[in-house]
């Protein structure tokens, strides 16, 4: 009977997790704007100067302003010389679809969709603003390629203002990396002082997330400040309230499941993280940097970083100590992080993510074996106590208080813990949920094959074979458990339907997660046989 209740407990916890997850998606708390006194002056500097979002392909992209193409070992990028915006970015080492050679396109600008990275100089003498328009840069070439043996590639853009001041905007690409340095060099050859402020923003057409209850993915904004290490800021949040948070350092990003684009200004600079939504349905999130005063004859350099690539925790941590938090493992992050590390460790040896998941399963089941043994021992003792419990029920009838006291005395005398059978189940659920988020958030598992028909462990089994096998394994486990004659008939019927219900739920779960549960069931069946054989020798059935 205890085993049957445990399976019901699994079902209850499982459904509760799904409902809680959906509630979190609908009722996520909104961040509260706060300002640090150290950088309060930067919060409102030239906030209206940042160019508004444009819709569609800008008219400035004409035959006389040909896009600048940049190719590295990781990125295929196009830069618009009007403003120097990154209007296209394809990730060379990541495919759009597993069975096609087309690289994954993260940034693009078409007639119907915009997702670009914009940067510029605003302020009193800025060359980019909603009122003045954008600077028209010139460049020595329109095609740049990172050559063999070359570690960095510089793409310089030059603009000479009416007052003779030269503005040089340099994009620096690195071999093996997805981050781009964006550097401004201002040579003030005029007779008057200049005042400028750098900004960087990401613009994206508001597009619904391809999320579901069992596969909740996030598409929207995120930011970090000195007061808020990491906060998602959904498109709905942007439409309701504009961000305007002063901070030292910080970053602003757009997330799209396994991928992220982010502006990361210098950690020691006074910046303002902002967001807005245009009437045309474009969401903006970005930063405004510190204000620089440049004396006549002086030269000033202003820098920032832009990342456009996968949610690679190692690469993101090297850029900012909080940028890796975009890999959001939820409230069980403290458990998911070591699981991810162990998964990576196993994969480095076996070279197969499916085998790594199997090894994770064996590790978890091995660690929990002492508790599992105690669980089945407790269940066997409870079954042997059934005649005595029945006698107590007949003796005390409806007097629940006396019956409860008598039962507790009996448990104490026989050294039986009535809750002993639940502990392993309760301990397994956090591990299951943490692994669920690891599979959902870790880009390494995108398009990761296992064997045979499983070509991508991060999506559902295309033929539903694993969920069906998982359901069969649950049915076998159920049949191995004796049903107590005193068990409620309604509970018996619910138990009979549990394998079917779980199979239906797992049809849409990532194949890697179903593999974990299936292998776990097979190991549990094996452990159950071994434990029952040992209990039989002790006279426990």
UniProtKB/Swiss-Prot annotation:
GO terms for biological process: protein insertion into membrane; protein transport. Belongs to the OXA1/ALB3/YidC family. Type 1 subfamily. The lineage of its organism: Bacteria, Pseudomonadati, Pseudomonadota, Gammaproteobacteria, Alteromonadales. This is Membrane protein insertase YidC. One of its GO terms (molecular function) is membrane insertase activity. Its main location: membrane. It is found in: Cell inner membrane. It is a multi-pass membrane protein. Keywords: Cell inner membrane, Cell membrane, Chaperone, Membrane, Protein transport, Transmembrane, Transmembrane helix, Transport. Required for the insertion and/or proper folding and/or complex formation of integral membrane proteins into the membrane. Involved in integration of membrane proteins that insert both dependently and independently of the Sec translocase complex, as well as at least some lipoproteins. Aids folding of multispanning membrane proteins. The chain crosses the membrane at residues 6-26, 325-345, 349-369, 420-440, 457-477, 500-520. Interacts with the Sec translocase complex via SecD. Specifically interacts with transmembrane segments of nascent integral membrane proteins during membrane integration. Gene3D superfamilies: 2.70.98.90. Pfam families: 60KD_IMP (PF02096), YidC_periplas (PF14849). HAMAP family: YidC_type1 (MF_01810). One of its GO terms (cellular component) is plasma membrane.
